[in-house]
A protein has these predicted regions:
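Amphipathic alpha-helical interface segments
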Residues: 100-103, 108-139
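Small-residue-enriched segments and motifs
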Residues: 5, 90-93, 127
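A residue-level detector for short acidic-glycine micro-motifs
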Residues: 9, 94-97, 131
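Short, positionally conserved secondary-structure boundary motifs
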Residues: 1-57, 67-71, 135-139
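Short intrinsically disordered coil segments
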Residues: 21-26, 61, 95, 109-111, ...
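Generic detection of short hydrophobic beta-strand segments and adjacent strand-loop junctions
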Residues: 27-34, 93, 116-120
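Short acidic/polar capping segments at secondary-structure boundaries
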Residues: 12, 85, 111-112
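Hydrophobic protein-protein interaction segments
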Residues: 36-101, 105-107
Length: 139
């Protein structure tokens, strides 16, 4: 059977943490159906260019939520919600093992973005990127 993946709009003040909550009140704006797609929990539009050219702003990424940061596969691409001084920062990055205990290294595909080490405890939500969809024309 063809999987029906909910597509959410998290532009503006919306954040990932409620989207990942078990009883989320966020309504999908649409549904995506792709043959042979691995199991996904949802999809969102990409904003920003940290993973450009692999994924660019406006692309759709499909994700599978992780309940525990320790389940990360080092080197894979993730959608992350990070606590930055009380504000939520949403990003798509490769997650690599850090040399520092209790930290992870966030790596961009885009060479104009520097790698960043963050404390694991600052990660509010994390999801593995399973697929992406790129539109070449709109309309």
């Amino acid at each position: 059977p063809l999987q029906s993946v909910p597509l959410y709009s998290i532009e503006g003040p919306a954040v990932l943490t409620p989207l990942f909550a078990e009883e989320s009140k966020l309504e999908p704006v649409n549904y995506i159906h792709i043959p042979n797609l691995p199991k996904c929990d949802g999809a969102i539009y990409v904003v920003g260019d940290s993973i450009y050219p692999l994924v660019k702003s406006g692309d759709i990424i499909l994700y599978k939520q992780l309940s525990d940061v320790r389940d990360v596969f080092w080197g894979d691409m993730y959608l992350l919600s990070i606590d930055m001084d009380g504000e939520e920062y949403i990003t798509v990055k490769y997650v690599q093992k850090s040399e520092q205990e209790g930290y992870v290294r966030l790596v961009s595909q885009n060479q104009h973005h520097a790698d960043k080490e963050i404390e694991i405890s600052r990660i509010r939500a994390i999801a593995l990127i399973k697929a992406s969809v790129r539109m070449h024309t709109i309309g």
